[in-house]
Regions:
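Terminus-proximal functional modules
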Residues: 1-214
Length: 214
């Protein structure tokens, strides 16, 4: 079962995942790049303590050491990969602490890591926006013929040579007129989404640090 959810707070996400576990749905996967898709599998209902972290690892060995460290402390890694960022743990030892973080600064650091990674994701989409703008042809919305730039195409007689030129250029014409606007829209949407995550996470990070010093 897949569910689409967005959380700006790890605490709210943890509570929701615990409720899903109580309803008989175990978290199996959270998509990468901070997307909103959670994958669950049916499981016996259980009252469980779930905690979330955010880390990206350079090597698989570092990731495995990270999971092992938590497991030795009574927390089992239930979802997340080396590159996914979002990491989820279930408490398996009732004698372990109720949190995977020892203090507020370390708990706040996950928001800083999330903010930095969201900002980095923006750089993937910005070139796509500029690339789309470079090939965009606004005249196409009023005059679709303008998408075909072969000289004299529309003044030529409709014959075999005309159809060959028309069909040959069609993929490029569609890209200029329709793929480019879609690419610009999609890339802009993702860029704004990641900028929002960056700003929101940075704000929570600062609030947590300020609250800890008061």
């Amino acid at each position: 079962m897949k569910k689409i959810k967005f959380f700006s707070s790890f605490q709210d996400e943890e509570k929701w995942l615990e409720q899903m576990a109580a309803d008989g749905y175990k978290l199996a996967k959270r998509n990468t790049l901070q997307t909103l898709i959670y994958t669950f599998v049916p499981a016996p209902p259980e009252q469980v303590c779930i905690r979330a972290d955010y880390r990206v690892f350079k090597t698989q060995h570092d990731f495995q050491d990270y999971c092992t460290l938590f497991e030795d402390s009574g927390w089992y890694h239930i979802a997340g990969t080396k590159d996914s960022g979002n990491q989820y743990f279930k408490r398996i030892d009732e004698n372990s602490n109720e949190d995977i973080f020892s203090d507020t600064p370390s708990r706040a650091e996950r928001y800083k890591r999330l903010s930095n990674n969201a900002f980095a994701c923006c750089f993937f989409f910005v070139p796509l926006i500029f690339g789309g703008l470079m090939i965009l042809n606004l005249d196409a919305f009023l005059n679709p013929r303008a998408l075909w730039v072969t000289p004299g195409l529309w003044e030529s007689e409709t014959n075999f040579m005309w159809w060959r030129a028309f069909l040959f250029e069609m993929p490029f014409a569609l890209m200029r007129g329709y793929v480019a606007p879609f690419m610009i829209f999609l890339s802009t949407t993702f860029t704004l989404f990641y900028l929002f995550i960056m700003a929101k996470s940075r704000k929570i990070y600062r609030m947590m640090l300020n609250a800890d010093t008061d």
